[in-house]
Amino acid sequence: MKDYTYSVTEINEYIKDLIEGDPYLTNVSVYGEISGVRPRKGHIFFSLVEENARLECVIFGGDNMGIRLQEGRMALVEGSVSVYIPHGTYRFICSNVRYLDQAGMYQIKFETTLKKLLEEGLLSRPKKTVPRFPRKIGIITSRDSAALQDVIRTARERKAPIEIYVFHTSVQGDSAREELIKALRKANEYDLDLVMIVRGGGSKEDLWVFNEEDVIREILRLRHPVVTGIGHEIDRVIADFVADVSMHTPTGAAEYVIPDASEIHEDLDSFFEKLITSLSNRFDMEERRLETLYFRLRMIGRRKLELNEFKIERVKELAAKLRKKLMDYFEHNQKKLDSLGRMLESLNPLRPLERGFVLVKKDEKIVKESTDLKRGDVVSLVFKDGTKKAQVIG
């Protein structure tokens, strides 16, 4: 593909296919200011402009349809983007034109911004939890507004122990957008329990600053829970969609956020009652558990004692058996020793001497036969009470 050489027409045709085949550029609506209206050969050429951009448009056969465009009017045009191959330019082919008044313009911008935030998932993000008993509340509004007085009056009536921090900003007019963004950033620097954004009712134009995209994104950056109370019952701004809680009026927001002193006392009474009940139940449970453990320990101790007593008796029995076996062993061996003693005694060569016999020894050897002696031999005669020498004479 890198070596392929395109003609100008091929490039333009390829771009035309890409653009006209894109569903996001087909049958869409665009709003802007009508400028440079140029009727030509039954067609109407013009531009839709805004501060820093321009879109060339054409209505084919516009003259025949009786369409008359007015310079400087805001309009919503419907159609599709197309490419004009001979010039290599794109343009918007219009199928319908609808003029917009101020309210219509605001509605278009409202829907466009809301859709953009929705597609980014910013409207479906998890909501922060608003504390039941806040102590430090930041209020973003005009210091001279009736909305602020509504909040302060509600706080006084409810006698709630809270601290209020006011972050001043204009809430309508040319400077409102910039001041509101600064107030939001300032509030984000404080250690607050929540932030309230409040303003009294007004026209769509008066409330428009709360629909500005950069203001909405700044609200989303707040690290505190956000509660809005903007306008009256019928008013609805984009800030309400991104807030963690949205109320219809400043007073409604204040009543939601600021607890009544009586509610605090009731909640405290309820809390202590629940605490006492919980502690009592826990005490009873622990008491039963200790009783069970005590019973088990007693049973274990008793079983161990019984087991030890059994072991002691067993040892005594074994000791008695061992003692008896030892006595029997000693007695048996004593008899054997006595018998052996008698046997040894009977074998004693000196025993016959007591009965008058004489033991004849020659050279310390016992003479058993007469032939062991000859005449003249000197022998020892062993008597029971001594020894004598003798000589053989015959």
UniProtKB/Swiss-Prot annotation:
UniProt cross-references to Pfam families, sorted A to Z: Exonuc_VII_L (PF02601), tRNA_anti_2 (PF13742)
A GO term from the CC aspect: cytoplasm
Membrane-spanning ranges: none
Catalytic activity: Exonucleolytic cleavage in either 5'- to 3'- or 3'- to 5'-direction to yield nucleoside 5'-phosphates
Keyword Cytoplasm: yes
Primary localization class, coarse: cytoplasm
Family (UniProt): Belongs to the XseA family.
Protein name: Exodeoxyribonuclease 7 large subunit
Organism, as annotated: Thermotoga maritima (strain ATCC 43589 / DSM 3109 / JCM 10099 / NBRC 100826 / MSB8)
